[in-house]
Design a protein with these regions (language model features):
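Soluble non-cytosolic domains of exported or imported proteins
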Residues: 49-61, 114-118, 122, 141, ...
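Boundary at the C-terminal end of the N-terminal hydrophobic targeting segment
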Residues: 19-21
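Acidic/His/Gly-enriched intrinsically disordered linker/tail segments
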Residues: 142-214, 227, 245-248
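Bacterial N-terminal signal peptides
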Residues: 9-16
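Juxtacatalytic substrate-recognition/specificity segment
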Residues: 27-139, 143
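Beta/coil-rich, acidic/histidine-enriched accessory regions frequently appended to metallopeptidases
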Residues: 247-323
């Protein structure tokens, strides 16, 4: 669940359900049918109601994108797939959101969060959680690096492939989590797992946790693609977790993630996890790809773009149909 670093945004998020229920005169209910997807809107204000078509476009695009990724719709608490979702929307000063089974909450604005998130990418982050976090779920907060970091990774990959951000911007945006991770005060002192061990630690180590997890996702996906000639990726890993870890039966932990990667790709990443996820070593981004060179060649040297084909796939600039 994506929470803004600002305490005000966090407070708005915690109070969202009661605020929607308690404010008379601001409710506007609307049900929208989009194919097999049913959205039950609860708008808190006229500004949000006026953007219904925009919200619907992002939500339906996101659901269909992730449905293809996971090869199934999100699951409820009994393990049954669903396509009807309540969406509570309000306009506010800070971006924030929340996801629970059959429920999306969004506080939106026209501003940016940390220079990278707009309300569309934030909403794609929350939609991803209908699968990862709510359909299959972590045992405890020590897996939040995966839960939140991979949601960031896939939100921006989806946004790129769906056309909400440009391919050029996808490369520039990818530099942000790398920078935030490398400048986090806990880097080299606190493992990614310990960074999310409880709510206070998660807040205190926001950039290490969220952006470290995002960097881990980029490195793992790129490495899997490189070592398997693009035959496998994190997509198969996420699908495996969805299929084998429904939250009503069992919850996953770090060892299960390693097992899922091996099942989905045939590769063993125990050493990677020991050093960079459970340990405090800094992930060696430059050993995997040169993001600046990939952007330079994207802009000016099309004949050199083949050198970055796996990275372009990782970020959603190329799709797996463009091999």
């Amino acid at each position: 669940m994506f929470r803004a670093y600002q305490l005000l945004a966090a407070a708005l998020l915690i109070a969202a359900s009661t605020a929607f229920a308690g404010e008379s005169g601001v409710f506007s209910h609307q049900t929208v049918q989009a194919g097999d997807i049913t959205l039950h809107y609860e708008f808190a204000d006229a500004q949000s109601l006026a953007k219904q078509r925009e919200f619907t476009a992002v939500i339906t695009d996101g659901i269909r994108y992730y449905q293809q990724l996971f090869a199934g719709y999100p699951l409820d608490l009994t393990g049954k797939p669903y396509t009807d979702i309540t969406v509570r929307v309000r306009h506010g000063k800070h971006l924030s959101g929340e996801a629970d089974p059959k429920l999306l909450l969004l506080t939106w604005s026209d501003g940016m969060m940390f220079g990278i998130h707009n309300w569309q990418t934030l909403l794609l982050h929350e939609i991803f959680h209908l699968w990862s976090a709510e359909s299959f779920r972590y045992q405890n907060g020590r897996e939040h690096w995966f839960n939140e970091g991979f949601a960031e990774f896939y939100a921006f990959k989806a946004a790129t492939q769906l056309g909400y951000i440009s391919k050029r911007d996808a490369l520039a945006i990818a530099a942000q989590p790398i920078g935030f991770y490398h400048s986090a005060t806990g880097l080299g002192k606190l493992s990614l797992r310990d960074a999310g061990k409880d709510n206070q630690s998660k807040l205190d180590n926001y950039f290490l946790l969220y952006h470290g997890g995002w960097v881990a996702a980029m490195l793992l996906d790129h490495d899997i693609r490189s070592r398997t000639a693009n035959k496998h990726s994190l997509d198969t890993v996420m699908r495996w977790l969805y299929q084998h870890y429904p939250r009503n039966i069992k919850l996953y932990n770090n060892a299960d993630i390693i097992a899922a990667i091996k099942a989905g790709s045939g590769l063993d990443y125990q050493v990677f996890f020991t050093r960079y996820i459970e340990g405090t070593d800094t992930m060696p981004v430059a050993q995997h790809f040169d993001l600046g060179k990939a952007l330079w060649d994207f802009e000016f040297n099309p004949e050199q773009q083949h050198q970055h084909v796996y990275l372009y796939h990782t970020l959603g600039i190329l799709t797996d149909r463009q091999l």
